[in-house]
UniProtKB/Swiss-Prot annotation:
It comes from Sordaria macrospora (strain ATCC MYA-333 / DSM 997 / K(L3346) / K-hell). Glycans are attached at residue 282. GO terms for molecular function: metal ion binding; metallopeptidase activity. Belongs to the peptidase M43B family. Disulfide bonds join 233-260. It holds the Pfam family Peptidase_M43. This is Extracellular metalloprotease SMAC_06893. The active site is at 198. Zn(2+) binds at residues 197, 201. One of its GO terms (cellular component) is extracellular region. GO terms for biological process: proteolysis. It is found in: Secreted. Residues 1-18 form the signal peptide. The lineage of its organism: Eukaryota, Fungi, Dikarya, Ascomycota, Pezizomycotina. Its EC number is 3.4.24.-.
């Protein structure tokens, strides 16, 4: 991952420095920009969705139930070392359910494990960590709660065609900075919506500012064009004035404060369902 490689360099900074600045930082998602191959996959899915709608189809989408496994990877057994409480984890699941329930998606906590490993806790040796900890199948969500992710608050992997037990299969899931969970101490980002955002990527969603003001943007028709990520909650922001609509600052796939986040669109719901059904729903391993 190109973006993630840069973030790992920052993660190697001394722990004392991380503690000094760790409670105040801007939102930054470490998920790689979608590859050409993945964009082509998204184009094909979008075309199928559009053709279905044009033909007068009305989708009776079944509810999606996702099993979730939490892996807390800390540098010590203290909260400041990333050792989050079970209450924080339960509250995080509640936040996810509140955000996704209107779109027919439910999350069930299936297990939580704790590991103290100073290297893994700062996102070192990602593949080795995931080979040791990953649980479930490709349709199950693994969330790795880490002490430090460099400049990022989280990152995740898009759904794709994978072979069981391949490296891509193991990499799947989301890594989340520990103090973004509900009750964490990261100013403006401690209500749990970093996980909401990253899980959106796990379902195949791009950032709302993908592609800027031109082209197909995020390939979802009902998200207004957006030139760049938002910061804070800039009401009335219109970074693409020649395009219809104000910037979707309340959309979970922007970079707004947790208090500003409110919604996914109907088109994003359809996209999440399409990706899940095509690449995850029937996974047996």
């Amino acid at each position: 991952m190109q973006i993630k490689s840069l973030l790992l360099a920052a993660a190697a900074a001394p722990a004392a420095l991380g503690a000094a600045v760790g409670t105040v930082k801007p939102f930054n998602c470490g998920t790689d920009a979608p590859s050409r191959q993945h964009i082509q996959m998204t184009k094909e899915i979008a075309e199928k969705e559009a053709a279905f709608t044009a033909a007068g189809g009305v989708s009776a989408q079944a509810a999606i139930n996702v099993n979730v496994y939490f892996h807390v990877v800390a540098s010590s057994t203290s909260l400041s070392g990333g050792y989050v409480t079970s209450t924080m984890i339960n509250n995080q699941v509640s936040v996810l359910n509140t955000a996704y329930a209107p779109h027919g998606i439910q999350f069930t906590l299936k297990g939580t494990d704790y590991t103290v490993n100073s290297n893994w806790a700062v996102d070192g040796s990602e593949l080795a960590m995931k080979k040791a900890l990953r649980k479930g199948t490709y349709k199950d969500l693994n969330l790795y709660i880490l002490k430090d992710l460099g400049d990022a608050l989280g990152y995740c992997y898009f759904p794709t065609s994978v072979t069981s037990k391949s490296n891509d299969w193991y990499y799947d899931g989301c890594s989340i900075l520990y103090n973004t969970l509900p009750g964490g101490d990261l100013t403006n980002y401690n209500l749990g919506h970093t996980s909401t955002h990253e899980v959106g990527h796990w379902f195949g969603l791009y950032h709302t500012f993908q592609g800027g003001c031109t082209g197909n943007g995020d390939y979802v028709a009902d998200t207004p064009a957006q030139a760049s990520a938002s910061s804070g909650c800039p009401t009335g922001r219109d970074s693409c004035p020649s395009q219809t609509g104000l910037d979707p600052i309340h959309n979970y796939m922007d970079y707004s404060y947790d208090t500003c986040y409110e919604e996914f669109t109907a088109g994003q719901k359809t996209r999440m369902t399409s990706y899940f059904n095509q690449y995850r729903a029937n996974a047996s391993v």
